[in-house]
């Protein structure tokens, strides 16, 4: 999926590059890739493995996933985020009884989307992933439950919760209402800023246009792309910065 470096992206629920009945690619860039995955109760995910050069992250939208985190195992219900730093052994599956839907984020992409294309076609493809026979090592994935995280509560209708802060990727959940003025049009030179609307509607300012986006919409602003947003009612979204580029630190200072 080739993108003009200066053009923002807006994809509504179900839109994107569909690889099969489960996987829809939302963004593929060197800095980050995002795909939305919808699996049934019989889904068996990858066994224990690690990545040397990128962060592998997840946000559970519906259902639950079971994660291997080092030698530990945990259940991640809807609203849980997981960010796995390089060299941490991890794996995941759907424990059932129902289906699950989640976002999978790789920062940088490290050829993950190209790997998926080959895997769907039944072809081998070498990328930054290394299988291990048994889980080992520390449980150092950053796991944050639905009501957890570093909450930055503002007096004007905004709560910004830091879910993960690493050099390569930071994750936030913003909850707000129309009392908050939102964010004026701006751009970043050093990272990709993207959003997934979890609930409600938001007016996004993308380039010279304003678009109303609802639940399940994904928006990405590559470096140089002008973007901003205006709340119109209670809403929440996942905000993703890749790389972090100091954004989490600046959020604390606001």
Regions found by a protein language model. Name each.
Residues 10, 71-86, 208-224:
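Short acidic-glycine-tyrosine-enriched beta hairpin
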Residues 45, 66, 80-82, 86-92, ...:
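Histidine-centered metal-chelating micro-motifs
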Residues 35-51, 172-188:
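Conserved short histidine dyad/triad with adjacent acidic residue
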